[in-house]
Design a protein with these regions (language model features):
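Membrane-embedded, lumen/periplasm-facing catalytic core of multi-pass transferases
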Residues: 157, 355-421, 427-429, 435, ...
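Membrane-lumen/periplasm interface segments of specific transmembrane helices
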Residues: 29-30, 183, 192-193, 207-281, ...
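Perimembrane helix-loop-helix junctions
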Residues: 3-5, 11, 181-219, 287-293
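Transmembrane-helix motifs of polytopic, lipid-linked glycan transferases
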Residues: 20, 94-114
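Specific aromatic-rich, kink-prone transmembrane helix
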Residues: 104-106, 126-130, 145-164, 168, ...
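Hydrophobic/aromatic-rich transmembrane helices and adjacent perimembrane loops
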Residues: 137, 143, 172-175, 181-182, ...
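Signature aromatic-anchored transmembrane alpha helix within multi-pass, membrane-resident enzymes
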Residues: 20-21, 215-219, 273-279, 288-311, ...
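Short acidic/glycine- and proline-prone juxtamembrane loop motifs at membrane-interface regions
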Residues: 40, 96, 132-143, 326
C-alpha cells in the first residue's frame, strides 16, 4: 500500500456527507415507484426470510429457509432496520437504497481521488444508471453491500491507510464471502509489484511483508463465521446442495472457459455497457487533450494495475465458482471499469460530456428494453414485470380458488406459502415441481389428484426473437453447464396436465398463467356448494 500510486488523500475525504445525501435523495426519487413491490426471486427464497428469522429469534442461522453459510452482515443490518422501523417492502427497499448510496459515495471518493471531480461526477451518474446497479439498488441481495465496502476499502488502500482498508475489506467479506477476493488480489499484487520493480530479492523486503501480512487480516472474521456456522449446522460452506451447485458442479474446464466468456461480456458489453467501453477504446486512438501546456492527467498506471488486478481476480474467481453466472456478482468491480472508461473519455475527447450523456441514454435504454437473448430479469426492470405478474396471479388465485391446492415451482411456491413476502394474505397448499419443462410436468401429470390448479410462469426469460436460436449447439451447452431449460407454453402444459388455461397475462417477455385441472372442475360442477359468483 503506497501513496506513490498517484492517489491524493488530502482531497478525498471532503464533502462526502453531501454526496451521500444527494445520492440517496436521487436514488429514492428514481426508485419511488418500485419501493412497494413484493420481494423477488432470491429475496423471497432466502435473504428476506433469513433476515426475518434473525429479527424474530436473534439467531443468525435461519430456520425458515436453508442455511447457505452466507455471512450475516446484511441480514443483521436489515433485522436492526426493521426493529427500529417497520417490516414492509418499502421500508426494506429504502434500507437497501442507503447501501446503494454508500456505494455511490465510495465511487465518488475513489474517482475523485485517482482522477478529478468531473470524472467522479460522471462516473457516479453512469454507475447509478447502469441497469444492473440500478435494479440491484432496491433488491435484498448481498452484492451491493459487498460493492460498497470494497470500493471504500480500495480508496483507503490507495491512500496507504492500511487499517481502514483492512477493516472495510473485512466488512465486505462479512457482507458476502466472495468479496474476500479483493484483498487476496491486492496481497498477490503487493508480492508481485516489487518483483516487477526490483527483482525477486524485493519479495522479502519489510514493506512487502508488512502489506502482505495486513491483507490477510480480512479473512479472519470470515473464517470465524464459517467455523461458527460449521459448529451450529455441521457444514462449513452451507448445505450440501448449495455446495454442489456452486462449487463441485462448476469445476469443469469447458464450463470455466464458457463462464469466463460470459464474465468478460458482463464487464465490457452487458446491458449496453459496450457503448461506454467501445467509446473508450476508440478514444485511445486520439491524442491526449491539453490543459494549458500540459496534457490532461490520466489515472496513474499503478492505480490502473491495482484496478486490473482486482477486476481480473473477480472475473477469474466467478468463472470457477458459482452455479448461477449473474452480473450482480461483479458489482464490486463494474464501477472500476466505468471509472477507467470515463477517465479515458475525459482525457482524450473534447466533447466528452456528450459522449457520457449518450452512454447514460444507452443505460436507460437497457433498463427499459430487454436484450434479444435470455438474461436474468434482476438485471433491469424486467424484475418489476415479473413481480407485478406474480402479485396479480396470487390475487387471482385468492379470489377464485382460495382453498385450492396449487401446483407451481419455486419461487412461486414460497410466494404462495409465506404471506410475509407480500403476495398473499393467507398461505396456499402448494405442490412443488422443479420447473415447467416437459419432464417435471409429465411427472406431475401422473398424479393430478394432489392439486386443483397450476400456477405456471416464465422461469427463464425467452425473447420472441432470440439471437441464440441461430446457434442450436449453444442451447445444449447452456442446458449442460448452466441449468438452462425451456418452459412449456401454458397451452402445452394444460394439455399435458389435463386442464385448461383460465387466466394468463404477459409483460415484455415475462408471462404467468393459471391452469384449472379438469378433474377439479368436474368436482366443482357436481358439488352442491359450488359458488359461481366467487371472484
Amino acid at each position: 500500500m503506497s501513496q506513490s500510486s498517484g492517489a491524493r488523500p488530502g482531497r478525498a475525504g471532503l464533502g462526502l456527507v453531501p454526496v451521500f445525501a444527494l445520492s440517496f435523495t436521487l436514488l429514492f426519487a428514481l426508485h419511488a415507484p418500485l419501493l412497494r413491490l413484493p420481494y423477488f426471486w432470491d429475496e423471497a427464497g432466502h435473504f428476506v426470510p433469513a433476515a426475518r428469522d434473525l429479527l424474530l429469534s436473534g439467531d443468525p442461522i435461519p430456520t425458515s429457509t436453508l442455511s447457505n453459510a452466507h455471512p450475516p452482515l446484511v441480514t443483521v443490518f436489515l433485522a436492526l432496520w426493521w426493529k427500529l422501523g417497520a417490516y414492509t417492502p418499502a421500508s426494506t427497499r429504502t434500507a437497501m437504497l442507503l447501501v446503494a448510496a454508500l456505494a455511490l459515495t465510495g465511487v465518488f471518493r475513489l474517482a475523485r481521488q485517482v482522477a478529478n471531480p468531473q470524472v467522479a461526477v460522471a462516473t457516479v451518474v453512469c454507475t447509478a444508471l447502469y441497469p444492473v446497479f440500478f435494479a440491484q439498488s432496491t433488491l435484498v441481495h448481498l452484492d451491493m453491500a459487498a460493492a460498497a465496502f470494497t470500493l471504500w476499502g480500495l480508496s483507503f488502500y490507495l491512500e496507504d491507510r492500511r487499517w481502514a482498508a483492512v477493516s472495510l475489506f473485512a466488512l465486505a467479506a462479512l457482507a458476502k464471502e466472495t468479496a474476500i477476493v479483493a484483498p487476496v488480489a491486492l496481497l498477490l499484487w503487493e508480492l508481485v509489484r516489487p518483483v516487477l520493480a526490483r527483482g525477486w530479492a524485493a519479495v522479502g523486503s519489510e514493506p512487502a511483508r508488512r502489506s502482505a501480512s495486513l491483507l490477510w487480516l480480512p479473512a479472519l472474521p470470515l473464517a470465524l463465521w464459517f467455523l461458527y456456522h460449521a459448529q451450529r449446522t455441521g457444514y462449513i460452506f452451507g448445505n450440501p446442495e448449495f455446495v454442489r451447485y456452486n462449487v463441485s458442479a462448476t469445476l469443469d474446464p469447458l464450463r470455466i472457459l464458457l463462464a469466463g466468456l460470459r464474465r468478460t461480456w458482463h464487464l465490457i458489453g452487458y446491458m449496453n455497457l459496450f457503448v461506454l467501453t467501445a467509446g473508450a477504446a476508440m478514444a485511445l486512438r486520439l491524442p491526449p487533450l491539453a490543459d494549458g501546456d500540459q496534457p490532461r492527467r490520466r489515472i496513474d498506471v499503478g492505480v490502473q494495475m491495482v484496478f486490473g488486478a482486482v477486476i481480473l481476480a473477480y472475473a477469474a474467481m466467478l468463472s470457477v465458482l458459482g452455479g448461477a453466472v449473474l452480473a450482480r456478482y461483479l458489482l464490486p468491480v463494474t464501477p472500476l471499469v466505468i471509472l477507467l472508461c470515463v477517465s479515458t473519455l475525459r482525457r482524450r475527447v473534447r466533447q466528452w460530456p456528450w459522449v457520457v450523456a449518450l452512454v447514460c441514454a444507452g443505460f436507460v435504454g437497457g433498463l427499459l428494453v430487454n436484450p434479444p437473448y435470455p438474461f436474468a430479469p434482476e438485471d433491469n426492470l424486467a424484475y418489476r414485470d415479473y413481480v407485478i405478474l406474480h402479485k396479480r396471479a396470487a390475487d387471482y388465485l385468492a379470489a377464485r380458488y382460495p382453498h385450492a391446492r396449487v401446483l407451481t415451482a419455486w419461487p412461486a411456491s414460497d410466494e404462495l406459502t409465506k404471506p410475509l413476502l407480500g403476495y398473499t394474505r393467507a398461505p396456499f397448499a402448494v405442490v412443488a415441481v422443479e420447473n415447467f419443462s416437459a419432464a417435471p410436468l409429465a411427472a406431475a401429470a401422473r398424479d393430478t389428484s394432489s392439486y386443483d390448479v397450476a400456477l405456471l410462469f416464465s422461469t427463464k426469460y425467452q425473447p420472441e426473437t432470440n439471437l441464440f436460436d441461430l446457434l442450436p449447439f449453444w442451447e445444449r451447452i447452456q442446458e449442460r453447464y448452466f441449468d438452462y431449460h425451456r418452459d412449456l407454453s401454458p397451452e402445452d402444459a394444460a394439455r399435458m396436465l389435463g386442464g385448461r388455461v383460465v387466466w394468463r397475462e404477459q409483460r415484455r417477455g415475462e408471462w404467468v398463467a393459471v391452469i384449472e385441472i379438469e378433474r377439479a372442475l368436474n368436482a366443482q360442477l357436481h358439488s352442491p356448494r359450488m359458488n359461481t359468483d366467487q371472484h
